[in-house]
């Protein structure tokens, strides 16, 4: 569902007094749903750091920057020096924070983050394949990829299979969330 559909559904629930409060399972910059709930004074909780009005919003979050840094540190400790990042756009705050942690780790280890080593998409409908193909087939390609979430990690694993890259022999992948998706891949994802 897009923001407009979710907003319509919430406005309908409010008009018909079908809900006392709302839980938003994401945090996104310029989110019309969160803006509407805030402007109407409706009780809501956001899973993820609030993008706007954080001091006036109830939210539950983990330290995504630290998680990104620690995951990248792990890859570095495993011997990887060319580590790429694959995630959703910076509009999704969790991904922006994980990318920031990835960049902090690289800098800490004396590696300059390269914009070309980051592939970001808005939706799975985006044409991410050319950018991923360029990244993964270039001379000196990454030996590891930090991925913002398990769904994208599955997408990456399938794409690597098309390219003939074997996980983890040719490319290591580390992701987040430890969801069911991470356990149904072959081999299972590190998450």
Report residues per predicted region.
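Short acidic/histidine-rich motifs immediately flanking catalytic phosphotransfer sites
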Residues: 15-21, 139-143
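A composition-driven signal for long, intrinsically disordered, charge-rich low-complexity tracts
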Residues: 10-11, 15, 22, 180
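Bacterial carbohydrate/catabolite-sensing allosteric modules
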Residues: 36-46, 50-191
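Structural motif corresponding to alpha-helix initiation and N-cap regions
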Residues: 7-8, 30-31, 125, 129
């Amino acid at each position: 569902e897009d923001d407009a559909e979710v907003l319509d559904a919430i406005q309908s629930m409010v008009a018909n007094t079908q809900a006392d409060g709302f839980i938003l399972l994401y945090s996104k910059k310029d989110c019309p749903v969160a803006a509407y709930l805030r402007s109407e004074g409706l009780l809501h909780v956001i899973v993820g750091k609030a993008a706007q009005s954080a001091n006036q919003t109830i939210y539950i979050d983990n330290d995504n920057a630290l998680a990104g840094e620690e995951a990248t540190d792990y890859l570095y400790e495993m011997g990887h020096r060319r580590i790429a990042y694959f995630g959703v756009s910076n509009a999704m705050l969790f991904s922006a924070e994980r990318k920031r942690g990835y960049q902090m780790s690289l800098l800490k280890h004396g590696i300059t983050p390269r914009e070309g080593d980051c592939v970001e998409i808005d939706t799975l409908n985006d044409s991410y394949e050319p950018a991923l193909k360029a990244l993964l087939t270039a001379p000196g390609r990454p030996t590891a990829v930090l991925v913002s979430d398990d769904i994208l990690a599955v997408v990456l694993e399938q794409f690597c299979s098309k390219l003939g890259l074997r996980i983890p022999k040719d490319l290591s992948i580390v992701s987040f969330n430890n969801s069911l998706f991470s356990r149904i891949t072959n081999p299972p994802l590190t998450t």
